Amino acid sequence: MSQPAGGRRKPRTLGPPVCSIRPFKSSEQYLEAMKEDLAEWLRDLYGLDIDAANFLQVLETGLVLCQHANVVTDAALAFLAEAPAQAQKIPMPRVGVSCNGAAQPGTFQARDNVSNFIQWCRKEMGIQEVLMFETEDLVLRKNVKNVVLCLLELGRRAWRFGVAAPTLVQLEEEIEEEVRRELALPPPDPSPPAPPRRQPCHFRNLDQMVQSLVSHCTCPVQFSMVKVSEGKYRVGDSNTLIFIRILRNHVMVRVGGGWDTLGHYLDKHDPCRCTSLSHKPGSFLKPPAPPVQHEVRVQDGPSQTQPTMTISRSQSPPPPVDWKTYTSSDRRLRPPTPSSPRPRRERGAGTGASREMAPFLRCQERSLIPSWRQPTAGDSPPSPQSSSTQKGRDPQCTSSGKREERYPPELPRGRIPTSWVHEETDSWGTDAGNPTPQRLRAIEATTKGISARGPSPLPRSFGPAECLGLRLPLRDEAKGAFFQFREPESVRSPTPVQGLTKIPIRLPPARPPTPGRSFPGATSGSPRTELGRDPIPLRAVTVDLAGSTHGDCSVEVRQEDQQLDIQVMAEARESWDLGLQEQEGRYTPLPLGGNKEQAIYCSLEEEILGNMKLLEVRSACPQGTRSGVIPRSGVYIPRLAGQWPEPGGPYDKAIQELAQGSPSLLKVDLEAWKAAPTGSPKPAVTPGPGSLKGKLGARQSGPRTKASLSAKGTHMRKVPPQGGQDCSASTVSASPEAPTPSPLDPNSDKAKACLSKGRRTLRKPKRVPSIYKLKLRPRIRPRRDHRPEKQPSRIPRPLAYVFLGPARQPPKDRLLRAVLGSKGGEASRVDGASVGEEEEEGKEEKEPAAPLESSPQPPEGLQPHWLNQAPLPPEEESWV
């Protein structure tokens, strides 16, 4: 007889509880129903005071079990005498069970009684092993389920001998009789005895209880239970028939050879409640009915087909979809509604800008996540309103009449499309045509619209080679010019209000970005960006980081480097194209030529020079004038009260230092880092004349570290030679304002001890000696007589005998150390290079990690006396 799933429960153990695969709350309900039925059965048979609560307590002594086994044996022998022919076809018990009637719960006698009953069930009744239990399953409550199933099977078999059976066994016989009538099967041989008369099941309440339990599922398509007849239902999409009966307060389901509650059965078989495929019927499946579906159509354009999104509600409802924020993966750009935020490239743009943007918007499409580009460290996650990609490669027309493929750039809000820029020049300066007034008016109108919106959030940070920029310079000779250059720059609006209008244009990157090279852009309150009507030839624009006191990197037009920069920009454009092709896996990178390499070196030198000048400005800026707001790009640029520096300031000094040559490197000796007395002069270590190489090393170490060191007040000082010593050491003092004791101070030892507390936090010893070598605690030998069978015990020497013995002369090295220590303490006050000072330094180097609170320094007058009281040698020590 197979029983419902659940398995043998493991006993409770210490540690984390073992969770079931299906932790249903109803897994113990059918056991409770069975215990109620068995308790009522035993109460009717033997008149016991037993119910489901004390069911196991009554049975744990084994007396009731052995008594019932003997009753069944007597009934079997009587049945054998009455009908020997029928008795030969079924197993019959021949021998009863011996029992100890004085057994108490938990004793060995009780265990013997239970064990005798188990052996009788196996040998005499032939109950299957899968339904049997062990002694501890009942005594220690390790497996209550098998105890119940074994008693139920015993009642089922004993009913054939005429012994009264539990109610569940009677319900089983009614169901089997109903099945035999429907299928016209012959009666079993031997025929079972007539069941006792009992009150029939009330089927009028059964259907209501079934519908109530099934209605717990809230799915649109509930787990189907179709009523076939009274107490018979067809469940799910299969042809499975189940028989349902009411047992007191429980709705029981006949499953296989056992019983289960309807609630637990639904938990295991309802797809809404159990998602495990192992518990769903795999055979006799008919075609499933079409589930309830919701069809949603999203129209992306008048000329596009309507994509259909189907939501299946067959098992569990999906999470709700917010259609206000839903965006399909191939939705195009639409004109913004008044309620939605308008893109930055569309707000405030004039008629000319709309004319220029029309062909661009036709070839641009929005998507949630660009599939061709992986986000970099500086990128922010794109949103449906801000991210846009260009799918495919639409050819764009240049001013020279050529058609070239434009690589798909990512254009966040606030950036001008690349198609506006490449129409001015072809391949970075090959087209010398002047910009037409229509194009200038379009860009002017767009720039006005972008800058007239007032303050806006900071743009996303990007690398230097990731985008290009447009610059409208401040100076008169540069007005009206339309520039392109190799580094990202900003548009300076000619207004007294401090601010920048940033119109970057993105091209594929050529080299990894330089750290700290992204410039934060800020929009002014009402800046005016004007473009002159007189076109002038293209000129190069380079970066001068030191020319800005506002922290905004201004751009200086250099006339003399015009031809070289144009060539560099053309070569950089080629390298960008090659870099993108390399990323797409089509071409291999070409080696750099001599001119190109020299041009890259020149650009790197200019960048490094500008960064070092900016660092000088940052270190010269007082800390109180810095703004507390750090831009998103992570580059913190101080603003010096909104004024330009006067000529001849720190920049000229920095240029002079760079022109003098490389500085001499100072070798730092970590062993000689010791505090110097305040009485001696302390000239500060000043760096020598710096060069580009030295400044570059300082820059690689990090400008933030330099700024933080200067802010904390940490100083590097050079210690003069003391007492004829040639070695000089540089010490790092975390608190230079703290007073340092002079060598003439009588309490110099205590002062040194106090000072060494701060010094040890800055000094890491090479090795940490053993605490027993430092003699900080008495040396205690373990007893050796704990195993007398291995070696004879030794009686420790009494302490009195040690002190009454002949006084031994201390070793010579100890006396010499005491004398040198006493003389050295006096000589150190006169001469700094005495032997005592060397001895103290040697001790400090020998014991660098000794904690001060564990080894206090003795007074100078008592130092020799303390040395004589050193720990005794091993042969003179006492045993504990």
Swiss-Prot record:
Keyword Translocase (UniProt): no
Bias (Pro residues) ranges: 185-198, 506-515
Matching Pfam families: CH (PF00307), GAS2 (PF02187)
Compositional bias (Polar residues): 301-315, 725-734
Keyword annotations of the record: Cell membrane, Cell projection, Ciliopathy, Cytoplasm, Cytoskeleton, Membrane, Primary ciliary dyskinesia
GO CC terms of this entry: ciliary basal body; cytoplasm; plasma membrane; stress fiber
Region Interaction with ADORA2A: start-end pairs: 438-880
Residue ranges annotated for the Calponin-homology (CH) domain, each copy included: 32-159
Subcellular location: Cytoplasm, Cytoskeleton; Cell membrane; Cytoplasm, Cytoskeleton, Stress fiber; Cytoplasm, Cytoskeleton, Cilium basal body
Domain of life from the UniProt record: Eukaryota
InterPro entries documented for this protein: CH_dom, CH_dom_sf, GAR_dom, GAR_dom_sf
GO molecular function: actin filament binding; cytoskeletal anchor activity; G-protein alpha-subunit binding; microtubule binding
Principal place of residence: cytoplasm
Biological processes, Gene Ontology terms: actin crosslink formation; microtubule bundle formation; negative regulation of microtubule depolymerization; positive regulation of G protein-coupled receptor signaling pathway; protein localization to microtubule plus-end; regulation of cilium beat frequency involved in ciliary motility; regulation of microtubule polymerization or depolymerization
Compositional bias annotation for Basic residues: 757-767, 774-785
Region (Disordered): 180-200, 283-360, 372-437, 489-533, 676-880
Gene3D superfamilies xrefs: Calponin-like domain (1.10.418.10), Gas2-like domain (3.30.920.20)
UniProt domain GAR: residue ranges: 201-273
Tissue: Expressed in bronchial and nasal epithelial cells (at protein level). Expressed in brain, kidney, lung, testis, fallopian tubes, and skeletal muscle. Expressed at low levels in stomach and colon.
Subunit structure: Interacts with ADORA2A (via its cytoplasmic C-terminal domain). Interacts with GNAS, GNAL, GNAQ, and GNA13. Interacts with MAPRE1.
Known disease link: Ciliary dyskinesia, primary, 41: A form of primary ciliary dyskinesia, a disorder characterized by abnormalities of motile cilia. Respiratory infections leading to chronic inflammation and bronchiectasis are recurrent, due to defects in the respiratory cilia. CILD41 inheritance is autosomal recessive.
Protein family membership: Belongs to the GAS2 family.
Protein name as catalogued: GAS2-like protein 2
Organism (species): Homo sapiens (Human)
Gene expressing this chain: GAS2L2
